Each structure stands twice: as C-alpha cells, then as structure tokens.
C-alpha cells in the first residue's frame, strides 16, 4: 500500500531532507607547538618597500592553527618596514636597538623595552636608527 504524505507530515519530511549537512570542522589545535628560531629564520628585505635588509623569524607560520601572527624581525642598519595601511591593531615591541615608529604622520623613537600599539586604519611603519640592528616583535591578527 502506498501512502501519500500531505500537509504537515509532507512539510516535515521535506524539511528533514533539505537540512544541509554540517560544515566540516577544522582540525583541532594541538596541545602546543614548539618552534626553534633557527627553523623559521630568513634573511630578506623588509616588507612594504623593501628598504634595506632584515632577518625575519616568522614564528607563527610554523603553527597549524593560530589566532594571531607573531614575528621577530631584525632591521639591519639603514633598513625600514615602509609606511603601509593596516586593517587590524598591531604591536611593535623592541627587544634591542633603536628605531623610529610612524603612525598617521606622527613619529616616536623606540628603544629596548618599549612598545608601540598601532590602531586599525592607521598608516604605519618603522625604521632602524642607531649603530645596532633594531630587533622587534610584531604581533597582529592573521590575514593582515
């Protein structure tokens, strides 16, 4: 015997059939990732203008699942990360050396132990000054 579904039973049946499959879930993050600087070290011109030379340690690039970027960079004498717009907040933290940070036309000197918190929408950059390389940590959300 064939029974036709009509009304609410038909609507319930069609709704159940039309429910999309759940989206695939990303792989779970591991308990931790340990990264050696030497494994992520690259000598290259700095970003945003390629002014001079630098050493970059793209620490967070070695992490499979991440919520922010964490990089160490040494700007060699005379080099700079050129002025560029940012679409996220960003932090420059100086480990050693001296530099001048730029944000929307304002400039400030940074030395070891100082940080610049830079806001979304700003035009930012930093240049090395002084006799030693400017070594800094740069942190920001991914995709920036």
Where are these regions (language model features)?
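A short, N-terminal "cap"/entry segment at the start of jelly-roll beta-barrel domains
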Residues: 18-67
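Bacterial N-terminal signal peptides
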Residues: 5-16
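Compact, glycine-rich, soluble single-domain proteins
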Residues: 59-60, 80, 104
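Short acidic-glycine-tyrosine-enriched beta hairpin
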Residues: 106-121
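Conserved short histidine dyad/triad with adjacent acidic residue
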Residues: 69-86
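Ligand-binding loop in jelly-roll beta-barrel domains
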Residues: 65, 120-144
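Glycine- and acidic-residue-biased ligand/ion/polar-headgroup-sensing regions
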Residues: 87-99, 104
């Amino acid at each position: 015997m064939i029974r036709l579904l009509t009304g609410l039973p038909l609507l319930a049946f069609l709704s159940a059939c039309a429910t999309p499959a759940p989206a695939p879930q990303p792989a779970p993050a591991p308990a931790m990732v340990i990264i050696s600087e030497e494994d992520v070290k690259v000598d290259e011109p700095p970003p945003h203008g390629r002014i001079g030379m630098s050493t970059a340690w793209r620490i967070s690039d070695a992490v499979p699942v991440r919520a922010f970027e964490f990089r160490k960079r040494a700007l060699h004498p005379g080099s700079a990360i050129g002025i560029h717009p940012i679409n996220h907040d960003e932090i420059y933290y100086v480990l050693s050396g001296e530099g001048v940070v730029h944000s929307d036309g304002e400039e400030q000197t940074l030395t070891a132990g100082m940080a610049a918190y830079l806001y979304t929408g700003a035009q930012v950059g930093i240049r090395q000054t002084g006799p030693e390389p400017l070594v800094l940590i740069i942190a920001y959300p991914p995709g920036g």
